[in-house]
């Protein structure tokens, strides 16, 4: 997921900025 939000089990939603 690029420039989006990923939710992992037992984790809070975090934003990914792979597309710098």
Swiss-Prot record:
Ranges where the record places region Disordered: 1-20
EC identifiers of the protein: 3.4.21.32
A Gene Ontology biological process term: collagen catabolic process
UniProt entry tagged with the keyword Hydrolase: yes
UniProt keyword list: Collagen degradation, Hydrolase, Protease, Serine protease
Domain Peptidase S1, residue spans: 1-20
Role played: This enzyme is a serine protease capable of degrading the native triple helix of collagen.
Protein name: Collagenolytic protease 36 kDa
Higher taxonomy: Eukaryota, Metazoa, Ecdysozoa, Arthropoda, Crustacea
């Amino acid at each position: 997921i690029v420039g989006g939000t990923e939710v992992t089990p037992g984790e809070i939603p975090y934003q990914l900025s792979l597309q710098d």
